[in-house]
Design a protein with these regions (language model features):
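CE4/NodB-like, metal-dependent polysaccharide N-deacetylase domain
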Residues: 78-99
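Short, well-ordered amphipathic alpha-helices
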Residues: 39-44, 83-87, 133, 155-163
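Active-site mouth loops of central-metabolism enzymes
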Residues: 1, 65-80, 116-124
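N-terminal binding-site loop/beta-alpha segment at the start of enzyme catalytic domains
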Residues: 1-58, 77-80, 93, 132, ...
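Short acidic capping loops at alpha-helix termini that bridge into adjacent secondary structure
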Residues: 50-53, 93-97, 143-144, 168-171
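Conserved, mostly hydrophobic/aromatic
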Residues: 3, 10, 18, 40, ...
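N-terminal small/glycine-rich loop or linker at the start of catalytic domains
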Residues: 1, 53-70, 99, 104-113
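Beta/alpha (TIM)-barrel catalytic core signal, keyed to glycine-rich beta->alpha loops juxtaposed to Asp/Glu
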Residues: 103-205
Length: 205
């Protein structure tokens, strides 16, 4: 009921862009995995206001073994399972913005410092990931795609490939940005301006 009240109030105040993730609620736990999407989906069913909301969610990369039975990655099989599961929990037939929650490759994110390169790490090539997202767009399951917790190199590479190969273009970057964490300004701010890819700042307070 509290969640429903929050969504009712948000929409009444003109807040119509809602972002969630298959991983949520936060802090992430196995027993609450997917619950935020379920609550939003139940609200959609009750209110019949899906068309009033711009809905964003995220597919999780590697790290948490309980996600989708383990072995989660950005390969076509796991990605297909993820998008279908999110659609079911959200009780909708499309997602407005579908984001990669964090990089699949070994790199720095979530505040990690001291980059250590590892050529032995295995990850799906960006072109293949974009190809999978293209299939979801073609099927009408998602409309736009975006990134989260990504680096300047990763963002630039995705944008380069989408232009070269005619694949879906990343439309947004959801990274932390606030008075105590201004790392976005180091490299990603320039990418945002020059390549016209917007920031969805999280933890702004």
């Amino acid at each position: 009921n509290e969640g429903f009240e929050q969504m009712d109030y948000a929409l009444d105040q003109g807040v119509n862009f809602w972002d969630t993730a298959e991983l949520y609620a936060v802090p992430p736990k196995e027993e609450t995995y997917g619950h935020t999407e379920i609550i939003i989906g139940n609200w959609f069913k009750k209110s019949n206001k899906r068309d009033k909301v711009i809905l964003a969610t995220k597919v999780a990369g590697p790290m948490r073994a309980y996600l989708r039975g383990g072995g989660n990655n950005y390969g076509i099989v796991k990605m297909t399972q993820a998008v279908n599961d999110s659609l079911k929990r959200l009780q909708t037939d499309y997602i407005d913005l579908y984001q990669l929650h964090w990089p699949e490759r070994n790199t720095n994110f979530f505040g990690k410092l001291g980059y250590e390169h590892d050529d032995s790490s295995e990850w799906n090539q960006f072109e293949d990931v974009l190809g999978s997202l293209q299939k979801f767009v073609d099927a009408g399951k998602i409309r736009e795609v975006g990134l989260s917790n990504e680096t300047p190199w990763g963002v630039s590479k995705y944008l380069e490939l989408s232009k070269e190969k005619g694949l879906p273009r990343m439309m947004s970057i959801q990274n932390p940005y606030n008075l105590l964490n201004r790392t976005y300004e180091v490299g990603l701010a320039e990418v945002s301006v020059r390549d016209k890819i917007g920031l969805l700042a999280y933890s702004p307070l």
